[in-house]
């Protein structure tokens, strides 16, 4: 099935989740070795749902560990996240997602 994108779905819950402030947020761009993160505030009983679309196959466990760590560190909840990946390394994934969540949690950000 060459040419088809891989779709992964995860659900995480932090111990003390904090809702994001922004109702919607877009961060990054799908470019070579990078990714975009789309966040949408959504009632999930404190959980975080993440959908990853990537051309890379066979690294589901790596995605799960990286995403779980970032969500745990960010202590967010009630947000649906979509990640559109273009061969980003785990370090780039963690950085971009952490940046997006930090901005979405910040009350100083303006809503577009």
Curated annotation (Swiss-Prot):
InterPro entries: Mal_deCO2ase/Cit_lyase_ACP, Malonate_deCO2ase_dsu
Location(s) in or outside the cell: Cytoplasm
Primary location recorded for the protein, binned into one broad class: cytoplasm
Keywords: Cytoplasm, Phosphoprotein
Gene Ontology cellular-component terms listed: cytoplasm
Post-translational modification: Covalently binds the prosthetic group of malonate decarboxylase.
In-chain residues carrying the UniProt-annotated modification O-(phosphoribosyl dephospho-coenzyme A)serine: 32
Pfam families, per the entry: ACP
Keyword Cell membrane: no
Record family assignment: Belongs to the MdcC family.
Function: Subunit of malonate decarboxylase, it is an acyl carrier protein to which acetyl and malonyl thioester residues are bound via a 2'-(5''-phosphoribosyl)-3'-dephospho-CoA prosthetic group and turn over during the catalytic mechanism.
Protein name: Malonate decarboxylase acyl carrier protein
Origin organism lineage: Bacteria, Pseudomonadati, Thermodesulfobacteriota, Desulfuromonadia, Desulfuromonadales
Encoding gene, per UniProt annotation: mdcC
